[in-house]
Amino acid sequence: MTTVERPHSIVVTLFLFLFAGGCGNRETQQQDHPRLSPKVTMTDVTFRSSALGREMPYRIVMPSSISPGQKLPVVYLLHGGGGGYRDWTNYSDVARYAESVLILVMPEGNSSYYTNSVEHPEERYEDYIVSDVILEVESKYPVAPGRPNRAIVGVSMGGYGAVKNAMKHPELFAFAGGLSAAVDVPTRPFSIKRVSQWRFHSSIFGPSGSETRRDNDPYVLARTVDPGRMPYLFLTCGEQEGLLPANRKLAEILQERGFTYEFHTGPGDHNWLQWNAQLPNVFRSLQERMGHAK
């Protein structure tokens, strides 16, 4: 376990804060200006998800040059609430990590929390991620087989989805990363100020105190699963974020139960500026622990 808390030392401009604003900005979400280099290729693909019963898109970024027979580890990148599958390439420089040794896959998750909905049982987004997307990608592209070569990372809602689904399906992933992960969503109490949000969360997770809530609660999972079977967990959160206490709480449980994990904090709020600052740490840790991504 490693816990790293960076000193307050970063000064940024107002322009960058506005550009990298929160993941709920639908106006910028509609634009598509991926940050790529000549060393990678990017493709948008649509496939039919059996779990959802409809066509779903994803974006895949790979090295421009892959040797015949070469197989590469894969990282599934989950977007945040209000965002979409293009966000990772539009608002971060994540594509550079695919220049030589990784395949990056960004599936569409809508506002699902990557969870099978209680109120709408046809919306099986957990099954879509852990079954359909993985099967689709790894049957079509030069992906190295097996758990040691597979990671899942997300921001905000996607961070929750990455951490939760990795703990529920530890046989699938060697590494899971949550950047500003909304790990407390299943346990948030009713608030008259946020009735619509509470109602939406209830439609996905079920009533407060229900079995479906507990089954999708990272705190409950962290207290009950076998730490020895879990993937390496990477958590990070900005020091100006409302989600910091929730992530600290999860890190404390991981520490108490002997998980292999690391937890980072640093200056920043709930936005891509802060997440971009953490990407080198994420991929350093990821590449140390995945199959051939050295």
Explain the meaning of each model-derived region.
Residues 24-294:
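Non-catalytic cap/lid and distal C-terminal segments of serine-dependent acyl enzymes
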Residues 10-18:
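Sec-dependent N-terminal signal peptides
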Residues 2-11:
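Bacterial N-terminal signal peptides that target proteins for export
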Residues 20-22:
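C-terminal motif of bacterial Sec signal peptides marking the signal peptidase cleavage site
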